[in-house]
Amino acid sequence: MTDKTENSGLSSDATEVRAQKLKLLREQIGDVYPAHFHRTMTNAELAEKYQDLAPDTETQDLVTVAGRVYSSRNSGMFMDIHDASGKIQVFSHKDTTPEEARGLLPMIDLGDVIGVTGLVRRTKRGELTINAQQITMLTKSLLPMPEKYHGLADIETRYRKRYLDIMVNEESKLRFQQRSRIVSSLRRFLEDEGFMEVETPMLQPIYGGATAEPFKTHHNTLKLDMYLRIAPELYLKRVLVSGLTDKVFEINRNFRNEGVSTRHNPEFTMMECYWAYADYEDVMGLVERMFETLALAVHGTTEFEFGDKQLSFKGPFPRVSMPAAVKDATGIDFLAIKSDEEARQAARDAGVEIEKDATWGEVLAFLFEEKVEATLIQPAHVIHFPKDISPFAKEVPGEPRLVERFETYCNGWEIGNAFSELNDPVEQRARMVEQMEQAHARGEKEKTLDEDFLDAMDQGMPPAGGLGIGVDRLIMLLTNSPSIRDIILFPARRHKSD
């Protein structure tokens, strides 16, 4: 019952031993990979049903379970098998287990998937156990299983072979179970708030809704270059124009052909929603309710640990304008600065290198990123962004250089981005033309106007608040995961030979 064997008829190589056992099993029992196996309950259901069974107690209850063999003792007399819900001990002995079933034990290796039928008992030591009466080979594993209690030492192997990571690392398994719970809770929260879920194109003839480098592909039949979407925004706004619903959301993948880091993966999950007849103030309240709901779903409380920090998702969150935050950090009063050159010089005087053609708003945003962002540990809304980096947001009344936009930060990370959405079609066209010209100046010659979206805006979009949430980063916070690779099942990796 190990990856080494004393049987002189078998190879000493663990992989070869398994291959030889597979051959013997095929000869002895036929189908080693049956199409179906009926179990009467999961391991967790078994544990719950018999939680009050006293030690050293036997029952006449016959059950059938299945799972992967994780450990074996006394030549297979005791085995621990795991399904997705938990562990159960299996006991095989000549007094309780027929010879035919015991005859299978030498053929079972760690990592094999087996089915067991037997009687439930609890041992003197209090271990819930099944006295095996029948053992069925369901899947013969041809590769040795990583050691359960040492896990995978190589972090790259954990990412490249996630199935092994989850198989031997309970923390990884729990993390991805929590991810599923968070996404389900997010969807349920939005539905309870009255939002309708829709699906918009992942393949788009014109990319838009954000400033990012897209992945490009080609549709052979349509003879059309297309792009994996960088954002669903322009399609979700079309939904608002249509009148299908006043509250719309989508949870799905976005793709950006850009850098990879502990917070960035080229394929990532976003939630975007749009709320007609609301503004960014309303959306701030929505974010606070959302964060509180998700923290309660995962932790049962709004207080939880991330690394060495104690975070609180209990609203309301503090609010600070971007110009005020930068002034507090640097002493530079951007609202008193009148020109782009004056803004650039102020940055240089503060010891910050800036692009020679950076605008007033770009300088303000850059200084915020450099001097403020990392200090925002507890959740906070940063409001009033520069208009020249926010082409889809309404102006702040009385301050035409700023817009009604906020980003929600936590642990120094941007988690959410929201606007009072621009719905003036004339102004929208002007800003998108300017955005396109800036893209062309950066060498993005393929960037074009989305005339269909602008036609939709001409039909009239109601006033609305819009929100995008980086679901992966939010999950990182809620699961105490320092890297985005820890919460994406199969993150993008460089080819192993590179």
Curated annotation (Swiss-Prot):
Keywords: Aminoacyl-tRNA synthetase, ATP-binding, Cytoplasm, Ligase, Magnesium, Metal-binding, Nucleotide-binding, Protein biosynthesis. The keyword Protein biosynthesis applies. It is found in: Cytoplasm. Its EC number is 6.1.1.6. Coiled coil: none annotated. Its cofactor is Mg(2+). It comes from the Bacteria. GO terms for biological process: lysyl-tRNA aminoacylation. Its main location: cytoplasm. GO terms for molecular function: ATP binding; lysine-tRNA ligase activity; magnesium ion binding; tRNA binding. The keyword Ligase applies. Mg(2+) 2 binds at E414. Mg(2+) 1 binds at E407, E414. It is an enzyme of class 6 (ligase). HAMAP family: Lys_tRNA_synth_class2 (MF_00252). Homodimer. Belongs to the class-II aminoacyl-tRNA synthetase family. This is Lysine--tRNA ligase. The gene is lysS.
